[in-house]
Design a protein with these regions (language model features):
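Loop-to-transmembrane-helix transition segments
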Residues: 12-37, 100-109, 154-172
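Cytoplasmic-side transmembrane-helix entry/capping segments in multi-pass membrane proteins
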Residues: 18-29, 73-85, 102-107, 126-138, ...
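Hydrophobic/small/kink-forming positions within alpha-helical transmembrane segments
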Residues: 28-36, 58-63, 88, 114, ...
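C-terminal transmembrane-helix exit sites in multi-pass transporters
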Residues: 57-79, 198-217
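Hydrophobic transmembrane alpha-helices of multi-pass small-molecule transport proteins
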Residues: 76-92, 215-234
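Transmembrane alpha-helical segments that form core, pore/gating elements
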Residues: 95-155
Length: 238
């Protein structure tokens, strides 16, 4: 029993005195801000617009990887990123003030998602997967409770079904996304991943009665086109 306690104590000390704890903390903060801004964006703009804006994480990740991780980026990617932000401008062009606020939240979410991707990319080269997952879960849960504890309601009886449905769909999405990369080529996954914009548009139209004007639709198509090729060139370079 004493021997077991000593081993457990040593393990706990090793975990919580992790020398990459600052990066784990930064990653958790990125995740919290991304999640909060993502939900705020969904409460203001349409489902299809929010899904499309989410793909701008490809632009931000390419830029951050060049600046922080010193990864090389070719001129084609730079031109595509600039062209992609033209699509965002077109989406914002006809927007009223509230919708513009939603686009800002969506872009902020995409930026912090990119920060999370960069931090995970760094951590995977320095720390093991179990530590990365554990620290993210523990730190995120603690910070969310600390920041939002006054607004947290544990009375979930009215929304229990929707919360369970949201949890199941999120877990299913993560599972099938992981399996798709295991069983198929990345180039094909890139193409198929854009189907979420189609699903978001259709579901938003059928269930939420959402509508998209022609200028916004053009902006969406530009973002789809540019992020597709940024991803494609990145995969080919790797």
């Amino acid at each position: 029993m004493i021997f077991f306690s000593m081993i457990l104590k040593k393990k706990i000390k090793k975990i919580f005195f992790n020398k990459y704890i600052k990066i784990h903390l930064i990653r958790a903060i990125f995740g919290i801000v991304a999640m909060y801004c993502g939900y705020k964006a969904l409460s203001i703009i349409s489902l299809s617009l929010a899904s499309t804006i989410g793909f701008t994480k490809v632009f931000f990740t390419s830029l951050l990887a060049t600046i922080i991780l010193k990864e090389s980026v070719n001129y084609k990617n730079i031109l595509l990123i600039v062209f992609g932000f033209l699509g965002i401008y077109l989406i914002a062009l006809p927007s009223a003030a509230p919708q513009l606020e939603g686009l800002v939240f969506g872009l902020t979410s995409a930026l912090f998602v990119s920060g999370g991707i960069i931090s995970v990319s760094y951590l995977t080269k320095k720390d093991n997967t179990v530590n990365i997952l554990m620290f993210h879960s523990v730190i995120s849960s603690f910070l969310v409770f600390l920041i939002f504890y006054k607004g947290i309601s544990f009375d979930i009886s009215d929304n229990f079904f929707y919360l369970i449905l949201m949890t199941l769909t999120a877990l299913s999405g993560q599972y099938f996304n992981t399996e798709s990369y295991r069983n198929e080529k990345a180039n094909i996954i890139i193409v198929v991943s854009y189907s979420r914009i189609i699903f978001s548009t259709v579901l938003g139209f059928l269930i939420l009665d959402e509508k998209i004007d022609l200028v916004s639709l053009l902006g969406i198509m530009i973002i789809i086109f540019t992020t597709f090729f940024v991803k494609k060139y990145s995969v080919n370079n790797n």
